[in-house]
């Protein structure tokens, strides 16, 4: 989603493909009717659990509204501020309205705020506690700026398509990993009194054809994500279940179609899965311009349209009058919105909506300081921990008091201006050639208070050390001083909203690496990557001694990297995706789906692979990756021992969970602990470090391994710590499409614990 200004132009530029119509083309969407089951009526919010007080207040508030005031709450309006969207005020009842703004890694299009690390970077940290702290400090900036709702975080896309343009906004390709990190992120943000609108619900896995478009007089519908019930529950709905359980006050529905019904008027996904099965108490907001039906969308469970609506307004009251919509539906829409306002305690002491969001940052405006010195430590640490060291030949890193270093590559320098933080590109280049990459493009961009670029931070380090630095960041085949101790090469891999990537490598950057490596025996490569980046063209070069996937660290990029290069911090990041040896190893999930054959006007993307994406697919097909999911090196070594598996006897292991009233997140018994696992980890290396212990389970009739636990622990040199994992009923279950329940199967389950999805020194089993 995006600011109102420029919306039409942006949508017109979004990546679109179409097939010319033929006699065989399907020309009416009536062909697809019924593929997404109808679920009506839209359930009313119950105000259960932690929502009780907010709902009581909201119902009293809504009871005093006129029909027109209720309608006004359901659609955005223009306002003299820079918020991405606004809900109008109701002055007579002291409701000041709402400001909602991008994005999940810091505010966009404003000043006096920080540019935080992106979702993929947080995913690479594997640090739940840090994710919550990042959310809390980031949320406090939104609060000071008068932003009621943060448009994020992201768990859709999950990362099904390797070239997906927005994969970098999410945390991980694994639903369990993504779910735990989004849970902690939401808890942190909302603890600051700012609501989250978690996105994009659901199965929004490519940018190509995400919106309906007309080109040369040909109308092409948005792509349809066609998903079976089992895959939906076990993969794509999984992290959203954690979102609801965390209490997210809003969820943003997506652009594309789901089983040939648009995401923002799909009664199965909104009424059925979200509001009934998961017990969601907040409100559903459209992505910007994602409403395609009037009363059909409200009856399907949509509660708020952004940035405005031409299909609702007085049409809602007319529909109530003519009986095509129940008055209770409008009341529920308004109640959910106002209850969320109360739930965040924004009725008392919250700044005026949008007060710190100027419509034009270059015009005179009041300075509202969002950032705080209290955030500096968390800001830097969140940047540090998302770096992943994947090669370290002969312990090249950390650098050992070098007398001279040389820096090469376009990604080393800072930008010439901050305009990049505000712009929308009308295309998606393979790289950002003009400066270091701290964030991807589109509505997920953010506004840095400063940028610590790698070259700047390295020069500062050299000043402090009294050493020397040479640099040539523009040459493709630079000269290298033979006396240099290390050659640091900086490249990047760009991605943006609106477009899927054209590939996972770029020849120019690879050529730069090999050119330097041919002249320098100690070449260290840093990649700022907005998604998967292949390295097969040079990873085995004998002079490439170390490689870091630096992801998208935010404004502290250079400072964080220097902490790692010089050994003041020990790398602890792990990959939240699989890096293949060859692009073809991703198979049908490499490229986005394009319109073809009889579906030229109604693109169809069949998720026929089921749950087998990324490492699950590599395991199933026996493909050896370059670097597996969960992989990352350290400056120390960790030894695993003492696997202990103990079943919890006081919780039911019945086939289906005991019946219970639905709470936020679904049946509360899904979180009953069934199994406890513990392992001992010893730091047998030379320095203290953080290790991410990962637990995988082989569930009968499922993938070889699925992540079902991870803990990040600090271990001093020579010390041993015991790491414990608690596995709930959902963690060990599969979705029964007949019973429509989570099924705990009888049989033998495999348990694996170790350093990555393929480095698992401990293995055991248990039987249910």
Swiss-Prot record:
SMART domains: Fn3_like
InterPro entries per UniProt: Cellulose_deg_GH3 (IPR050288), Fn3-like (IPR026891), Glyco_hydro_3_C (IPR002772), Glyco_hydro_3_C_sf (IPR036881), Glyco_hydro_3_N (IPR001764), Glyco_hydro_3_N_sf (IPR036962), Glycoside_hydrolase_SF (IPR017853), Ig-like_fold (IPR013783)
Pfam families: Fn3-like, Glyco_hydro_3, Glyco_hydro_3_C
Signal peptide: 1-19
Keyword Chaperone listed: no
Alphabetical UniProt keywords: Carbohydrate metabolism, Cellulose degradation, Glycoprotein, Glycosidase, Hydrolase, Polysaccharide degradation, Secreted, Signal
EC class name: hydrolase
Protein's pathway: Glycan metabolism; cellulose degradation
This protein's record includes keyword Hydrolase: yes
EC nos: 3.2.1.21
An example Gene Ontology CC term for this record: extracellular region
Single Gene Ontology MF annotation: beta-glucosidase activity
Residues that carry a glycan: 25, 72, 259, 315, 322, 394, 434, 472, 543, 651
Reactions catalysed: Hydrolysis of terminal, non-reducing beta-D-glucosyl residues with release of beta-D-glucose
Residue ranges that the Swiss-Prot or TrEMBL entry lists as coiled coil: none
Active site: 287
GO biological process, one term: cellulose catabolic process
Location of this chain's protein in the cell: Secreted
Protein family membership: Belongs to the glycosyl hydrolase 3 family.
Functional description taken from the UniProt entry: Beta-glucosidases are one of a number of cellulolytic enzymes involved in the degradation of cellulosic biomass. Catalyzes the last step releasing glucose from the inhibitory cellobiose.
UniProt cross-references to PANTHER family, sorted A to Z: BETA-GLUCOSIDASE, BETA-GLUCOSIDASE M-RELATED
UniProt protein name: Probable beta-glucosidase M
Source organism (scientific name): Aspergillus flavus (strain ATCC 200026 / FGSC A1120 / IAM 13836 / NRRL 3357 / JCM 12722 / SRRC 167)
Organism ancestry: Eukaryota, Fungi, Dikarya, Ascomycota, Pezizomycotina
Gene: bglM
């Amino acid at each position: 989603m995006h600011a109102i200004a420029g919306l039409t132009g942006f949508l017109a530029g979004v990546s679109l493909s179409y097939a010319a119509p033929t006699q065989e083309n399907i020309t009416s969407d009536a062909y697809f009717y019924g593929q997404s089951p109808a679920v009506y009526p839209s359930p009313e919010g119950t105000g259960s659990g932690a929502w009780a007080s907010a709902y009581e207040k909201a119902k009293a508030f809504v009871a005093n509204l006129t029909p027109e005031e209720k309608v006004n709450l359901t659609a955005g309006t223009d306002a003299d501020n820079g918020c991405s969207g606004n809900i109008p005020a109701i002055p007579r009842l002291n409701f000041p309205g709402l400001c909602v703004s991008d994005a999940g890694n810091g505010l966009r299009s404003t000043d006096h705020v920080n540019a935080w690390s992106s979702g993929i970077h947080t995913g690479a940290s594997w640090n739940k506690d840090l994710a919550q702290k990042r959310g809390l400090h980031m949320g406090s900036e939104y609060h000071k700026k008068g932003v009621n709702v943060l448009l994020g975080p992201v768990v859709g896309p999950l990362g099904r398509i390797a070239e997906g343009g927005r994969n970098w906004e999410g945390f991980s390709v694994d639903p369990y990993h993504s779910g735990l990190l989004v849970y902690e992120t939401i808890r942190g943000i909302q603890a600051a009194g700012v609501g989250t609108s978690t996105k994009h619900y659901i199965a929004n896995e490519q940018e190509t054809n995400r919106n309906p478009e007309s080109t040369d007089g040909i109308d092409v519908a948005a792509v349809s994500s066609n998903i079976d019930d089992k895959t939906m529950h076990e993969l794509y709905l999984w992290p959203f279940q954690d979102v609801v359980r965390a209490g997210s006050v809003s969820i943003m529905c997506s652009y594309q179609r789901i089983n040939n019904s648009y995401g923002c008027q799909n009664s199965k996904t909104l009424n059925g899965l979200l509001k009934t099965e998961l017990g969601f108490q907040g409100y559903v907001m459209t992505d910007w311009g994602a409403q395609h039906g009037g009363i059909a969308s409200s009856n399907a469970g949509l509660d708020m349209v952004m940035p405005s609506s031409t299909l609702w307004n007085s049409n809602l009251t007319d529909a109530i009058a003519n009986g095509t919509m129940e008055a209770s539906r409008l009341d529920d829409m308004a109640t959910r919105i106002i209850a969320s306002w109360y739930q965040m305690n924004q009725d008392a002491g919250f700044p005026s909506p949008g007060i710190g969001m100027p419509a034009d940052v270059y015009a005179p405006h009041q300075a509202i300081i969002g950032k705080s010195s209290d955030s500096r430590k968390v800001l830097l640490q969140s940047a540090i921990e998302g770096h992943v060291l994947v090669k370290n030949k002969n312990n090249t890193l950390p650098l050992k008091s070098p007398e001279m270093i040389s820096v090469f590559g376009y990604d080393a320098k800072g930008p010439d201006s901050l305009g990049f933080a505000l712009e929308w590109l009308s295309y998606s280049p393979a790289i950002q050639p003009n400066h270091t990459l701290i964030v991807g493009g589109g509505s997920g961009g953010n506004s840095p208070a400063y940028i610590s670029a790698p070259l700047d931070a390295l020069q500062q380090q050299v000043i402090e050390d009294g050493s020397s630095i040479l640099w040539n960041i523009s040459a493709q085949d630079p000269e290298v001083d033979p006396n240099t101790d290390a050659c640091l090469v900086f490249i990047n891999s760009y991605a943006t909203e609106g477009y899927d990537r054209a590939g996972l490598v770029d020849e120019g950057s690879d050529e730069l690496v090999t050119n330097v490596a041919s002249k320098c025996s100690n070449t260290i490569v840093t990649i700022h990557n907005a998604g998967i980046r292949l390295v097969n063209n040079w990873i085995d070069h004998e002079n490439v001694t170390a490689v870091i996937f630096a992801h998208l660290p935010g404004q502290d990029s250079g400072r964080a990297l220097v902490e790692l290069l010089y050994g003041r911090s020990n790398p602890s990041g792990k990959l939240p995706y699989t890096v293949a040896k060859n692009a073809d190893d991703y198979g049908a999930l490499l490229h986005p789906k394009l319109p073809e054959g009889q579906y030229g006007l109604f693109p169809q993307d069949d998720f026929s692979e089921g749950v087998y994406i990324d490492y699950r697919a590599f395991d199933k097909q026996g493909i050896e990756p370059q670097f597996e999911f969960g992989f990352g090196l350290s400056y120390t070594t960790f030894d695993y021992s003492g696997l202990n598996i103990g079943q919890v006897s006081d919780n039911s292991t019945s086939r289906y969970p005991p019946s219970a009233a639905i709470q936020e997140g679904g049946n509360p018994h899904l979180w009953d602990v069934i199994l406890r696992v513990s392992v001992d980890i010893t730091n047998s290396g030379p320095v203290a470090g953080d290790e991410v212990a990962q637990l995988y389970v082989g569930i009968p009739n499922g993938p070889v391994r699925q992540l079902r636990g991870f803990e990040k622990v600090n271990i001093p040199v020579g010390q041993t710590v015991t790491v414990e994992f608690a596995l709930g009923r959902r963690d060990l279950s599969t979705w029964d499409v007949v019973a429509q329940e989570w099924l705990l199967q009888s049989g033998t389950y495999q348990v694996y614990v170790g350093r990555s999805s393929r480095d698992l020194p401990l293995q055991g089993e248990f039987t249910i």
